[in-house]
Amino acid sequence: MFKWPWKADDESGNAEMPWEQALAIPVLAHLSPTEQRKLTQLAARFLQQKRLVALQGLELTPLHQARIALLFCLPVLELGIEWLDGFHEVLIYPAPFVVDDEWEDDIGLVHNQRVVQSGQSWQQGPVVLNWLDIQDSFDASGFNLVVHEVAHKLDARNGDRASGVPLIPLREVAGWEHDLHAAMNNIQDEIDMVGESAASIDAYAATDPAECFAVLSEYFFSAPELFAPRFPALWQRFCHFYQQDPLQRIRENGLQDEDNRRIVH
């Protein structure tokens, strides 16, 4: 049984949140007890600081809110909750939503079109998500909408817009850019060979550096076994930035499970 690190009379009601049940999802399965307590503490603070706004009739239960907060805080487990400053609301649709998109082509013509989005992360505004894809983010599959949008927020802290290079020491920027672009080219080569649907890494990663960072952040936390061996140099840079090693967590958890089986038998 966890001893949760907040007061029972907390006005936010966080002391009554179903944290243990919320932690019971595959993407969080390999966290140590210490990491679970730390993540839950961050998630409680997240819910105190941010407003989750359910749209179009969606109802968010305490369990839903707890799991959303845990996923938001997973990337900043070691960075700190202050890395999520800069927005105050999370807007949540029931399903992917339609937005009016405006973009400028290479010759300066402005185009408008309606597009379906899974999520959005405004630099000086809210994070927008949808509940269907949030639920899919509970798995350890390489897809995680919440981590993706959080990665954009972290990326944008380094300048006016997300660039694929988060806030790292200046001396590391050139190496980061080199390894990130090498990964993009590698992913594009695979797409050219087998097609987008058959590619082992989400093809969206090849579109631009910011999306590559966000997509690979999804794999970093939810499918490290696909990321680490394919891009070992970039993997080490992600470990250094996030101050976490999800692949090592899996290995340590596996060894612990093996030890437990030996004790049982």
Curated annotation (Swiss-Prot):
The keyword Electron transport does not apply. Gene3D superfamilies: Collagenase (Catalytic Domain), Glucose-regulated metallo-peptidase M90, N-terminal domain. SUPFAM superfamilies: Metalloproteases ('zincins'), catalytic domain (SSF55486). Coiled coil: none annotated. One of its GO terms (biological process) is proteolysis. It comes from the Bacteria. It is found in: Cytoplasm. GO terms for cellular component: cytosol. Keywords: Aminopeptidase, Cytoplasm, Hydrolase, Metal-binding, Metalloprotease, Protease, Zinc. Binds 1 zinc ion per subunit. Zn(2+) binds at residues 111, 148, 152, 211. CDD domains: Peptidase_M90_mtfA. Disulfide bonds: none annotated. Its EC number is 3.4.11.-. GO terms for molecular function: aminopeptidase activity; metallopeptidase activity; zinc ion binding. Its cofactor is Zn(2+). Involved in the modulation of the activity of the glucose-phosphotransferase system (glucose-PTS). Interacts with the transcriptional repressor Mlc, preventing its interaction with DNA and leading to the modulation of expression of genes regulated by Mlc, including ptsG, which encodes the PTS system glucose-specific EIICB component. Shows zinc-dependent metallopeptidase activity. Interacts with Mlc. Belongs to the MtfA family. This is Mlc titration factor A. It comes from Klebsiella pneumoniae (strain 342). The gene is mtfA.
